[in-house]
Amino acid sequence: MACRYPFSPAKVAITRFFYPSPLSRSTTPLFCPPSCRIRVGNTSRMLTSSSSVASEDPKSEMAKFLASPNPKSSASEPGPSPHDVLSAPTSAGHISEAEETLSDQLRNPGSSSSSSPSQSSTNNLSSKNAPFKLSSTYSLPSNISVPPEVREHLIEWSKNVLEHSRYVIQEAQKKFVGLGLKVNEMTGYQEVERLKYMVFEKEDELQRLREHARTAKAAYDEAVAARSEAQRETNILLERKHSWTDADVSKFTSLVRSDHTSSHAVASTSIALKDAEIAVDKSFSQLMQVILQRYHEEQVWSDKIRSVSTWANVAGLAINFIIFVGAVLLVEPWKRKRLVEKLEERVASMMERVDHRLEGVEGHLERVAAGSASASAIKEQHSDAAIQGVEDMPSNSTANPLEFVSPQTIPLMAAVDPTINGSESQSDPFFTQTIRGFPNYLDPLVKPSQKRDLAVAGMAGAVAAWILIGAVRLVRA
């Protein structure tokens, strides 16, 4: 089918991508308007998107045409022009109907609930056959009493909202149409539209010439039949020429006159038939030429759109390449420089903290060295005193040597030699039982010590972890 509605350019551009075949006339474009001209064979008629128009006005010509059983009878009527399109129901009509409905509901809030079930069923049945209408967004319940001032304000507000929405819709439609015209002008689609309308005109002209040729053919056939009938009757009279009467003579004269007239009619109708056939052939050739021109222009337009999209892709790739190069040459060095600066700042702060700590460690080492020197001196003094004491008291040789050391010198000596106070610094082991019967190289594991406690705790943890892993695997299985 071929739609004769002047599409907006944006819809035409989108339809072009969905229907790439330029000569395809068996499909309707994606954004076909509610009113289209449909061609089926040699007939041309106007249809609407729904039967609501015919149901609303059954006496209109459109309703009669749709109700007629033989639509081919209207094929001889001249088709409308490309701009003579049926006016489809617009949104403005629906908005006005919605406005009236809302006003009635606000004025009569209890009317909707006081209707009987039979009336509601009748309304439901009639609403199925009625055309689509915008219903009001809100209906007031019957148990709510609205003051007259509030009701008037609501009615005024609803009217203002509907008028504003109607104005916005109209302005949006105008802007879309203007945008489509600009797109058509920029892309050169106006020439394609002109050729499309020319194709429709040539089709109408070809249809008219074919009707004229059929009429000429019928007249030629009638003239030939009349001449044949006159010749047949003349031959019959000539066969009984010897028995003619006065009536036969007058009849023969009229037959000769009619034969002469029919011969002239046959000659004239044959010439008219030939002219009509030549005109039909010429119109058909012109139609094919216009179709080829339209196909060529559509191909040129498609190539132009394709080239524009190609250059757009190239421009996008170039922009992406520029961004990539800029990121590699400018952004990444700047990020690296900033990262290095931050790293240097952090390293400098860390080095400052390390320097402070090293200064503290050096002071501590100096104090430890001084303490160790004093401890060694005290140890030598006490060792000399101990040797003299041993010589004086040989019976006390088994005594502890630390007994001869004063309590004030023990911390200084422990700082130099940790083994002096090692028994006091270590905690008691958890397992105090000694295992016997093992060789000497297993003494760390046989005798009670912290190392044995740590080894036992590690083995117990390993066994518990192995048991837990096995349980988890069993649960998953």
From Swiss-Prot:
<feature type="compositionally biased region" description="Polar residues">
    <location>
        <begin position="45"/>
        <end position="54"/>
    </location>
</feature>
<feature type="coiled-coil region">
    <location>
        <begin position="190"/>
        <end position="233"/>
    </location>
</feature>
<keyword id="KW-0496">Mitochondrion</keyword>
<keyword id="KW-1133">Transmembrane helix</keyword>
<keyword id="KW-0812">Transmembrane</keyword>
<dbReference type="Pfam" id="PF05546">
    <property type="entry name" value="She9_MDM33"/>
</dbReference>
<feature type="topological domain" description="Mitochondrial intermembrane">
    <location>
        <begin position="332"/>
        <end position="454"/>
    </location>
</feature>
<feature type="compositionally biased region" description="Low complexity">
    <location>
        <begin position="111"/>
        <end position="128"/>
    </location>
</feature>
<comment type="similarity">
    <text>Belongs to the SHE9 family.</text>
</comment>
<feature type="topological domain" description="Mitochondrial matrix">
    <location>
        <begin position="476"/>
        <end position="477"/>
    </location>
</feature>
<protein>
    <recommendedName>
        <fullName>Sensitive to high expression protein 9 homolog, mitochondrial</fullName>
    </recommendedName>
</protein>
<keyword id="KW-0999">Mitochondrion inner membrane</keyword>
<dbReference type="InterPro" id="IPR008839">
    <property type="entry name" value="MDM33_fungi"/>
</dbReference>
<feature type="transmembrane region" description="Helical">
    <location>
        <begin position="311"/>
        <end position="331"/>
    </location>
</feature>
<comment type="subunit">
    <text>Homooligomer.</text>
</comment>
<dbReference type="GO" id="GO:0007007">
    <property type="term" value="P:inner mitochondrial membrane organization"/>
</dbReference>
<dbReference type="GO" id="GO:0005743">
    <property type="term" value="C:mitochondrial inner membrane"/>
</dbReference>
<feature type="region of interest" description="Disordered">
    <location>
        <begin position="45"/>
        <end position="128"/>
    </location>
</feature>
<feature type="transmembrane region" description="Helical">
    <location>
        <begin position="455"/>
        <end position="475"/>
    </location>
</feature>
<keyword id="KW-0175">Coiled coil</keyword>
<keyword id="KW-0472">Membrane</keyword>
<keyword id="KW-0809">Transit peptide</keyword>
<comment type="function">
    <text>Required for the maintenance of the structure of the mitochondrial inner membrane. Involved in mitochondrial morphology. Causes growth arrest when highly overexpressed.</text>
</comment>
